[in-house]
């Protein structure tokens, strides 16, 4: 096997880290899809089974073609998983994350039956907002960019032309007055705060202006002026004040995607006034005087804010006026920031395409009520997500990625490439059908067998009630079990899955959450209760996806509890058997022995290994270190540095773990010295 290392391709700006060369069906899939893109095919499908390395195939395609790429996932959990993997494959390139930055979001709404107006209320995640700004910056600056995102990318953000027009380019030796720099920063939605220096803030001390770029995770810019000339530009650490790098030039990007040049705002104010006059005349003619008064009061306040500050609360509702679009035209989105030759990958496309189609309708019905009752101008209807046909019109060359492509992919794909054989030689799980009337007792026996072997089990039920009852039953019988349901938020869901992998518990019960993309190699058994109840949760596609969760384990097995075999079950079992036969044949032909997947449990967003526990850190110290005094001293210095780094980043739990390991090592050194 070739040693891990970086691979480069002609005319490609990407440096691909290959932990291993492509294997199984990967080389054929990479060649076929790359050739399809080069031949100008718009739509292709990668039909890749679970654990066949679809992400690795995508990374190889991106590196070979050398074009910027957008990878769409159906939810934040899978997007985080893809982002972490892409960062491992492209550590030297710009891998960015673009998902909704709301931790909590209550949209503006009106309930006519109760005359209740609900103000927009939201909580924005600062870290994700910084990552979104970093994503658009990378797209505008570099060709070696991979963006991993969700359906959030079809919602309006600022016009790329306006956003680009607002950047502030600073060069050493350029002439610019202090007053002009400050005015430009305010126009870019930076705020002055000389006390609390955080992202999107600038501070001024005499001739020195410190700017904390909105898209920067940790470094700020120090601009030193000599009269009206830029004397120096330095990147520094805002915490310690230490200068990291001197720069000849620096580009400051706007503090928000919704920044707009002053002349555009003034032009928009006039068109908003014109629309307001027309709408008021219409409401008064219809005898809707309360609505007319309400609309005039709200809109005039917004106009005053726009006139004075250049932005207002809810500015996105005026996006049509600000972008100069015609009525009915959609707002600019992340897709508009992509170069014309960019690549698109839609992961788990059978789910994601459905989401892309459904976003527009729900948004429309809520806004129509707001317009009807005078809370918003009719142009607010054009601040909306893209319709599916509008998304299609903006699509770049695209690869649909799924183990179970739906009708849409089958109709649109010009080329279907199968990736059924896994690089590890693992084959699809054996599928068994057992009677449903004894399912719970039978399952309990199977769980005890797996738990004894340190393996994990996923159980999927049809209803919440059944999932709760089953969890209680298993818990009473001494099984370490957790229940995953829709009320659990994204972060907690990721933690539960991580705990399952770490062996904190052995069995995870769920309904519809144990499907697409869940990467849990430790799971050796998937049990599907009431598999013969035909419907969405037991359709052919759902069954294949759920069975696939056991495909990453050497002893993978799926048990379908059913009293009869439905058409969906038959098709799912036949497809699994077809794939299994092909995989076994490939292993036999090439003399491959299947090996299990060993994958580090990492924090998804930061892409780092999960923080070790107190004992784990100490036990992770190599045995030879404990017997060599010099090596032990080096290890103590390393742990001290690690502890300080964690403390500086406010990661106090990890800092405490490093401190405990440090104390344990020092005690060991002391005891050995005494002995």
Curated annotation (Swiss-Prot):
It comes from Bordetella bronchiseptica (strain ATCC BAA-588 / NCTC 13252 / RB50) (Alcaligenes bronchisepticus). Keywords: ATP-binding, Cytoplasm, DNA damage, DNA excision, DNA repair, Excision nuclease, Nucleotide-binding, SOS response. It is found in: Cytoplasm. Disulfide bonds: none annotated. GO terms for cellular component: cytoplasm; excinuclease repair complex. The UvrABC repair system catalyzes the recognition and processing of DNA lesions. A damage recognition complex composed of 2 UvrA and 2 UvrB subunits scans DNA for abnormalities. Upon binding of the UvrA(2)B(2) complex to a putative damaged site, the DNA wraps around one UvrB monomer. DNA wrap is dependent on ATP binding by UvrB and probably causes local melting of the DNA helix, facilitating insertion of UvrB beta-hairpin between the DNA strands. Then UvrB probes one DNA strand for the presence of a lesion. Forms a heterotetramer with UvrA during the search for lesions. Interacts with UvrC in an incision complex. Gene3D superfamilies: 6.10.140.240, P-loop containing nucleotide triphosphate hydrolases, UVR domain. ATP binds at residues 48-55. GO terms for molecular function: ATP binding; ATP hydrolysis activity; DNA binding; excinuclease ABC activity. This is UvrABC system protein B. HAMAP family: UvrB (MF_00204).
């Amino acid at each position: 096997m070739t040693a891990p290392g970086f691979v480069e391709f002609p005319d490609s700006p990407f440096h691909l880290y290959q932990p291993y060369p492509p294997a199984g069906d990967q080389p054929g899939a990479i060649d076929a899809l790359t050739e399809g893109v080069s031949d100008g095919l718009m739509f292709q499908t990668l039909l890749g089974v679970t654990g066949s390395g679809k992400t690795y195939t995508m990374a190889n395609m991106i590196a070979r073609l050398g074009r910027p790429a957008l990878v769409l996932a159906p939810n934040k959990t899978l997007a985080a998983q893809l982002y972490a993997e892409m960062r491992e494959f492209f550590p030297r390139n710009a891998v960015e994350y673009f998902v909704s930055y709301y931790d909590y979001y209550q949209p503006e709404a009106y309930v006519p039956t109760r005359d209740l107006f609900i103000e927009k209320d939201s909580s924005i995640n600062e870290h994700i907002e910084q990552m979104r700004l970093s994503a658009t910056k990378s797209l505008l600056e570099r060709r070696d960019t991979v963006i991993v995102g969700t359906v959030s990318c079809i919602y309006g953000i600022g016009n790329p032309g306006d956003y680009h027009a607002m950047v502030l380019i600073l060069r050493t030796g350029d002439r610019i007055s202090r007053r002009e720099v400050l005015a430009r920063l305010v126009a870019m939605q930076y705020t002055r705060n000389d006390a609390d220096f955080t992202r999107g803030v600038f501070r001024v001390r005499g001739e020195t202006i410190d700017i904390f770029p909105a898209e920067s995770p940790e470094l700020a810019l120090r601009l030193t002026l000599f009269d009206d000339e830029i004397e120096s530009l330095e990147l520094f650490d805002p915490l310690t004040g230490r200068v990291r790098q001197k720069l000849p030039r620096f580009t400051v990007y706007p503090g928000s995607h919704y920044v707009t040049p002053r002349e555009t705002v003034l032009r928009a104010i006039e068109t908003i006034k014109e629309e307001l006059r027309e709408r008021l005349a219409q409401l008064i003619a219809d005898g809707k005087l309360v609505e007319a008064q309400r609309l005039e009061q709200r809109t005039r306040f917004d106009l005053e804010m726009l006139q004075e500050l250049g932005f207002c609360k809810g500015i996105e509702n005026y996006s049509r006026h600000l972008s100069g679009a015609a009525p009915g035209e959609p707002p600019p989105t992340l897709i508009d920031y992509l170069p014309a030759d960019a690549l698109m990958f839609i992961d788990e496309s059978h789910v994601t395409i459905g989401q892309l189609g459904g976003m527009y309708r729900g948004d429309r019905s809520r806004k129509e009520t707001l317009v009807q009752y005078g809370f918003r101008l009719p142009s607010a209807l054009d601040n909306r997500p893209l319709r599916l046909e509008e998304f299609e019109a903006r699509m770049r060359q695209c690869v649909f990625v799924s183990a179970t492509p739906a009708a849409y992919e089958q109709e649109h794909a010009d080329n279907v490439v199968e990736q059924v054989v896994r690089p590890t030689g693992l084959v699809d799980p054996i599928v068994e059908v057992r009677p449903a009337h004894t399912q719970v007792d039978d399952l309990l026996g199977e769980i005890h067998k797996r738990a004894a072997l340190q393996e994990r089990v996923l159980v999927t039920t049809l209803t919440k009630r059944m999932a709760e009852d089953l969890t209680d039953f298993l818990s009473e019988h001494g099984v370490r079990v957790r229940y995953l349901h829709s009320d659990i938020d994204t972060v907690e869901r990721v933690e539960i899955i991580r705990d399952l992998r770490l062996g904190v518990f052995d069995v995870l019960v769920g309904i519809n959450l144990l499907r697409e993309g869940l990467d849990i190699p430790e799971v050796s058994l998937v049990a599907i209760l009431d598999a013969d109840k035909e419907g969405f949760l037991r359709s052919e596609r759902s069954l294949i996806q759920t069975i696939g969760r056991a495909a990453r384990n050497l002893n993978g097995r799926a048990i379908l509890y059913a009293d009869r075999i439905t058409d969906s079950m038959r098709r799912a079992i036949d497809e699994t058997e077809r794939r299994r036969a092909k995989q076994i044949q490939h292993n036999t032909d090439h003399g491959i022995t299947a090996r299990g997947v060993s994958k580090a449990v990492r924090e998804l967003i930061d892409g780092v290994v999960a923080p070790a526990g107190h004992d784990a850190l100490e036990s992770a110290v190599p045995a030879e270190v404990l017997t060599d005094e010099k090596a032990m001293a080096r290890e103590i210095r390393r742990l001290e540095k690690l502890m300080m780094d964690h403390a500086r980043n406010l990661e106090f739990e990890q800092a405490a773990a490093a401190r405990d390991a440090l104390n344990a090592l020092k005690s060991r050194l002391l005891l050995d010295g005494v002995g």
